[in-house]
Amino acid sequence: MNLYALQTEINGKENAMLTLLDADTMAQVKNQRAIVGLLKNQKGPITHENILYNPTFIDFFHKTMLVFAEFAAGTNVITSNGFMYVVDERCKTPDKPEQKDIIGSFEVQAGVVLKDTYMANTNYQFISDDGLFKLPAQIERVLFMALV
């Protein structure tokens, strides 16, 4: 997945809009869900702290995680009861992820992932020092296809 910084004007002021779609595709589909956010400081770096995140994108992103439950439903879940964490693939220590690397979690009962129990992690960093979020390939495809 790529991140694009598109220059736009909002209320007469130049802004860098961060999107998951390139300029041509954004012009065609005009999908608000593809806008990750805006840079707070236009001259500053693209970092978690310098982004005003788009609530529409955040909501869409986490709803896409429900698809993860569909993929996980047929897999061996490590725990029989408890929680299964959805961990960003950028994470260098997936066995002991930091809060910033945990996308969210599902409840597990008797080894079954309960789809409707997804809880988003408010500490998750969509963009970190390690770059843009990284999901399993099939989930990234679902996310991208829903945008175009």
Regions found by a protein language model. Name each.
Residues 1-148:
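The transition from N-terminal targeting/processing segments to the mature protein
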